[in-house]
A protein has these predicted regions:
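Cysteine-nucleophile protease catalytic domains, especially the papain-like/related folds used
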Residues: 24-111
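Hydrophobic transmembrane alpha-helix bundles
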Residues: 92-107, 146-152, 177-182
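Active-site-adjacent substructure of cysteine-protease-like catalytic cores
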Residues: 112-164
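Noncatalytic regulatory segments and standalone regulatory/sensor domains
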Residues: 151-218
């Protein structure tokens, strides 16, 4: 029998998929990007920060201008205002560097596993610790960022699906995810896995990953 594991910081109820923000308030976690921008990695970053209680919902409301006197305000201002319109996506190396040079007390760890088995194992490792993973998928013609929040294992304890929040798809209403990647079989093509949402299905491969953590000052 298959088993599903979702990070424990999120819950699904009649309002939607929610997490507690930095203020301890239950807020909707999924953020959907615009049709014209390529800032899927920034949306995934914001969702990761929300479900790890690094920011509050009010911090990211439209027309809410960040207070640049604080480290958090400087961080949000940099990504929301100084970076401008992101059309062609964000390189994870550059994104990690931008995060880590900010004064806000979080850090980004850029992971580049060499094989798909290593990538799946890394996602499992962090989901087991209830830490979401920003993952990059590549497809024929482009790349897309998602937030991995859960996994499915079969009766032999083999991972068969990676459950994600996709900023490019509608918010989930009846499950804790709005996208999954079927990794039960690895095809022989350049794009060996199926990516599935309610509006799209196409073949992808897994690529770089980002882990967002609180800085440890011990």
């Amino acid at each position: 029998m298959a088993t599903i594991q979702i990070i424990d910081s999120i819950r699904l109820n009649r309002i939607g998929l929610q997490t507690k923000d930095a203020n301890g308030k239950w807020v909707n976690i999924h953020k959907q990007q615009g049709d014209l921008d390529g800032a899927c990695s920034i949306y995934s970053l914001i969702m990761a920060m929300l479900c790890q209680r690094m920011i509050e919902e009010q911090d990211i409301q439209r027309y809410k201008f960040p207070d640049r006197r604080t480290p958090k305000g400087k961080f949000l201002y940099h990504f929301f205002y100084e970076q401008g319109f992101v059309q062609n996506g964000y390189n994870y190396t550059a994104l990690a560097r931008e995060i880590n040079k900010q004064p806000f007390e979080i850090r980004a760890i850029h992971k580049r596993p060499r094989t798909n088995d290593d990538r799946i194992e890394l996602i499992e490792q962090f989901v087991d610790q209830n830490i979401p993973v920003i993952i990059s998928t590549e497809f024929n013609g482009g790349a897309h960022a998602l937030l991995a929040i859960g996994i499915e294992r079969d009766e032999e304890d083999i991972i068969t699906k990676i459950f994600c929040l996709d900023p490019g798809a509608p918010s989930p209403k009846v499950s804790s995810w709005n996208c999954f990647i079927d990794v039960s079989k690895e095809g022989k093509s350049q794009y060996p896995f199926y990516y599935v949402t309610e509006i799209n299905t196409y073949k992808v491969t897994l690529d770089d990953m980002l882990i967002i953590e609180h800085k440890n000052f011990d």
